[in-house]
Amino acid sequence: MIDFRPFYQQIATTNLSDWLETLPLQLKEWETQTHGDYAKWSKIVDFLPDLHADEIDLKSAVKSDRTSPLSEGEKQRIIHHLKQLMPWRKGPYHLFGIHVDCEWRSDFKWDRVLPHLAPLQGRTILDVGCGSGYHMWRMVGEGAKMVVGIDPTELFLCQFEAVRKLLNNDRRANLIPLGIEQMQPLAAFDTVFSMGVLYHRKSPLDHLSQLKNQLVKGGELVLETLVVDGDVNTVLVPIDRYAKMKNVYFIPSVAALINWLEKVGFTNVRCVDVATTTLEEQRKTDWLENESLIDFLDPNDHSKTIEGYHAPKRAVILANK
């Protein structure tokens, strides 16, 4: 099982120390309610070899390597273990010559977001709904002091720990398997990311307030979410599914989203990027057995979802507390 005690020790002397009042008990409770496959997935992490990387690049990729390459047999054993943790959704990872080609080219999103951010050097960062942690490692690559990701999905936790093991057990990033609604208001993070989460929330304004409660005064929110065209009063509430996703509740226009953020008290709210999701950014690979974007779009008109809505378009909004 994954040991969270090193993280407790890390935060004990930081401005996250108040979290220790609740977090250890929450994670003990979490361990009693884990997915039936969690024990198997965590063992896969244990089975991965302890390799030392001579070269690690988190600035332009998430990559580890060493001067003496792995044998083909060693590579195949690692691939076998990593593929037992499929589906790999967010990446890519380049680990000792192994290309983990995930469904999403999350580096595309990072390249769109990064130029607009307050410098991450020396910052304490929270990544909400972090998945397997790809963007967390890129934040570390930008010089973040500490990155904490939260995501309740046990598979993502095990994927993250597998990658960490192949990055010389780097402790600058940590994934905690909780949702933001389970976090006490810490007001301790310099930057809070919420990317690809808001439209899954039944109460989007509550989510925005929860994000605000984790920021220091003056801290920066980085919000990335689905949007639709329209004015300040435009919000799509899909009747049943959106792009085959049942758990999509509210997709606002950019103007409506800015209004929401201002309504819960954020300042300096601005949209810095809008991009339609392409078939190059989200696609099927050998590391994903499920459907992907091509299956969610109208086969005769890729500008629409299979349900007839506009195809996925995502905005990046920055704001300050």
Curated annotation (Swiss-Prot):
Subunit annotation: Homotetramer.
Disulfide bond residue pairs: none
Catalytic activity: carboxy-S-adenosyl-L-methionine + 5-hydroxyuridine(34) in tRNA = 5-carboxymethoxyuridine(34) in tRNA + S-adenosyl-L-homocysteine + H(+)
Domain of life assignment: Bacteria
Keyword tags: Transferase, tRNA processing
One term of GO molecular function: methyltransferase activity
Functional note: Catalyzes carboxymethyl transfer from carboxy-S-adenosyl-L-methionine (Cx-SAM) to 5-hydroxyuridine (ho5U) to form 5-carboxymethoxyuridine (cmo5U) at position 34 in tRNAs.
Enzyme class: transferase
Cross-referenced PANTHER family: METHYLTRANSFERASE, TRNA U34 CARBOXYMETHYLTRANSFERASE
A Pfam cross-reference name: Methyltransf_9
Official protein name in the record: tRNA U34 carboxymethyltransferase
GO biological process: tRNA wobble uridine modification
Family: Belongs to the class I-like SAM-binding methyltransferase superfamily. CmoB family.
Organism of provenance: Haemophilus influenzae (strain PittGG)
Gene: cmoB
Keyword tRNA processing: yes
E.C. numbers: 2.5.1.-
Binding site for carboxy-S-adenosyl-L-methionine: 90, 104, 109, 129, 151-153, 180-181, 195, 199, 314
